[in-house]
């Protein structure tokens, strides 16, 4: 089977020392039923399919050209699966919407404005190199697909992104190269009859690292002359790409179709309206205030409608009313433009370079972190700044380029700003575009993450609109950020420039306007927005209704904008000349660092530790992969407290004997309470010490005095060689814990004879000494604890089985090499209910003797193979024969046993005749 005929052309972009890039246009393989379909490739690893399709019939009720541009970002293009719940692409991202605007703005003026057939351009991103941006590729692909679609299109138009890197303008720069860009500019244009390139669209801004590159490394500053040079540098690249599109049109274009055009009005109707309303409109268009002017114009229009009610009866009412409105609007346009071109006279009486009245205020909204109101004439912008932790920075699921940003600028323009009603809710494309432009203007002067570790959200509320709300947003944002305490490197201001062109006395002239009104924007040829500091430009945007504007006209407009920018900066500096003190309601963020290997300890299992710190202190904590810790709280006190805790975990201080702590009870047991001294460090406050909190009286349970969560003042009594900490109540630190007498006191307690001689304690073989001779005052009268409740795991050296109620840090101590007892022999001495069952075993395994198997305590000799006086080795369990601590363990074990002791008569003497 014979395949489709594929036709392709190439444009080679030579960047000198930065290498070459190849842009290839291919048609014939994909989307064969679209009017025009082109696959555009950049270096064969980024691919975008562009299709252009027109509706078969016109939309007669439309009074505008219905062009739609859509960008479809396919996540598979970057090897990703969409992160949404349904795992498929949904609404377009902000990046896709901005790409749509870049494509729409240069294409729209090249269609007949009286065309009423729907035209849709769809850009599908099929593959993208993660080091490349796709927006400019899509712009060129859109022009190419429209060129071969057979539509009435006065193309081609081409676009190029240039980056000023190390003093050279580089076309189609990679993301990695753009890190060192001082300035970036996207320029779209078309080749005109004289071979020059007319500029149709500009989107530009200083690089995010521009300040560092300019003032620390001495790179070129992007002032007006440098930016004008960038416009000239773009022309050769635009021409090369336009030539490739012309070549593609020659070999693949369809024949241009005939489309019905719908004139907006008839010449006769326009002449009649001019005759009726010219004088009145001339006067109305001299009213400076917007709303009174609009009211007067509406009255004139109604008068014209009444006069023409009986005229032009060959039109139906709807058609007549639509053409009347179009002709009336065109008459206003001609009056405004003629006065500017011939008299340098503007609607509100200003000169061409004059700026409207300016005012600026800060701190007008209570409790917010920063606020400001900037007003230029009737354009009024409220700026509000919010600061938060860096973890609140926006995550971007982009195909390429940055995946997050810490400065987020949102622009909103409600319908009441123009005195109208309308939809309120999610942002429209225009609002997203204006927010992105204001963001681009301010990013170069923001402090670095290290200098100011905050995520910043800036909202610009256009609460009054009469021209250039986007540049008003830049000014209001500068004021608001400074009021919030953000240490901007320099204040930024913005101004909107306009253009009116036409023939006067047989000569085509251009008049550039400073600070345009809404009506001048609507009736003019250009909206040229310029933002920057006093020394260089930070953002540019150009929209035009013309096929293109000469570069020298734009260069002159840049110089005119610089004058206006300086005037606005003076007003800003008078209002606030530097960053203010941060609001008391703004979070205070401090930083610390922990070793990477300690990050897990700070976070804890399943975030237990970090969540506990946040709960206890009220601070917010974020930890980055390199160990940098950001801690935030209102006022800063909680943040300092959290920092101290984190530092203690990362560089722990081991409590020492004699140190006093206000600790929190984290667990209670039958033998005492565990008290948290520092994060991750607990100590045991024995029940004998807890009695001191009850005036020394006997207590039945620890919970009668201390409960979990209580705070208690304790003193460190001692730290053993394994780091286990015993605590005491201050003033009673010399008191011995009954459950754990020190090793050195055994002689006093046992008559000084050690394990080999018990006569003093028992009064001879098998006999206990008198109770009054014992150190434990009332031991025999105390209720006995079951061994299962004996939780003194921290203070003996005996290995033991894992039990479900063991504390986590108890388990960590089981790293000794002592052999473990068999589980079958590891029984509680009080488990006597199943004694008979155990005795019925018929195996020959040796068993331990149980206390119930002996008639008297003196039967120990049978169990241990002889008298205790036979020597230290003869009474040792062979399983622990090699353990040097075995004797100590047995001594402790006997003193803590839970077995009921048999009462022995004091007057009984077994040796009596």
Swiss-Prot record:
Residues binding Mg(2+), per UniProt: 521, 527
The name this protein goes by in its record: Polyribonucleotide nucleotidyltransferase
Disulfide bonds: none
Listed cofactors: Mg(2+)
Biased composition (Basic and acidic residues): 742-789, 797-865, 872-898
Record-annotated KH domain positions: 587-646
One Pfam family this sequence matches: RNase_PH
EC number: 2.7.7.8
Major place of residence: cytoplasm
Organism, as annotated: Bifidobacterium longum (strain NCC 2705)
SMART domains: KH, S1
Any one Gene Ontology molecular-function term assigned to this protein's record: RNA binding
Protein family membership: Belongs to the polyribonucleotide nucleotidyltransferase family.
Enzyme class: transferase
GO CC terms: cytosol
Ranges for domain S1 motif: 658-730
Subcellular location(s) of the protein: Cytoplasm
Gene Ontology BP, a term: mRNA catabolic process
Reactions the enzyme catalyzes: RNA(n+1) + phosphate = RNA(n) + a ribonucleoside 5'-diphosphate
